[in-house]
Amino acid sequence: MSTLPATDTTLLSSELKLVHRLDQRFFALLDAIAQTGSINRAASTAGYSYKGAWMLLESAGNLVNGALIETVTGGKGGGGTRLTPAAVELLAVWRELQRRNLEFLHRQETWLNQLPALAGLLRRMSMKTSARNQFAGVISAIDTGPVTTQVTVTIAGAQEIVATMTTTAANRLKLRIGSNAIALIKSSAVVLVTDFAGFSLSARNQFEGTVSRVERGAVSSLVVLTLPGGACMTASLTNDAIDALSLAVGQTATAVFKAYAVMVAVQQD
């Protein structure tokens, strides 16, 4: 079984913690999936619950603009789960980054410890947020008005998410067309529609997809919608709403949310 390099307890974990929660533990999960062919066993190995592993894989897939795992059916072992080529490449890059940075930190440990400003910068490079939906993309359009500004972020599958913010906020973020950005939407802001009944909605953001997972809770549930480009949109609904819509895996539904519900994050210079 392959093993991942050990992580440094200070700067290395911060420097190599990629966007969202793509850290040593996450890549240990990918490595375990590659070794076991099972999300359940891999989650246990990496210290995740089964549900937590699924949610992290879906969220991370949005940030890297592609699915990280795929299901294999049939065969001698009866099928299972394996990493997609994108995930295999990501895991290989992570290992190489770890190797190079471990070497660097071991050579320069004393020097780095004398530069607290640099250490702080490395730690700030990893953003943490409670928003369930996080989509990495590129700013493709900016419509600036005297009071509000509309920003379009193009994500996987050429899907466009429109965000509305104050022009003051847009200026503060120094938004530019072609810049990388992350669109964040809380799951509670997403409405699922299964039948428009001939009506049109005013909400700017409407994404049709397929229900890929329903996680029922005591009162409310999470519904994951897979979009044509492979991104996953999560909506938080009451159990009564799920029953009323008769939501089930494989069903087509449309995720709807207002432009005002979208937050945009960009890396500052």
From Swiss-Prot:
Residues 128-194, 200-266 form the Mop domain. GO terms for biological process: molybdate ion transport; regulation of DNA-templated transcription. Pfam families: TOBE. Keywords: Molybdenum, Repeat, Transport. GO terms for molecular function: molybdenum ion binding. InterPro entries: Mo/tungstate-bd_C_term_dom, ModE, Molybdate_resp_trans_reg, Mop_domain, Transp-assoc_OB_typ1, WH-like_DNA-bd_sf, WH_DNA-bd_sf. NCBIfam families: Mop. Belongs to the ModE family. Involved in the transport of molybdenum into the cell. May have a role in the early intracellular capture or metabolism of molybdenum. This is Molybdenum transport protein ModE. It comes from Herbaspirillum seropedicae.
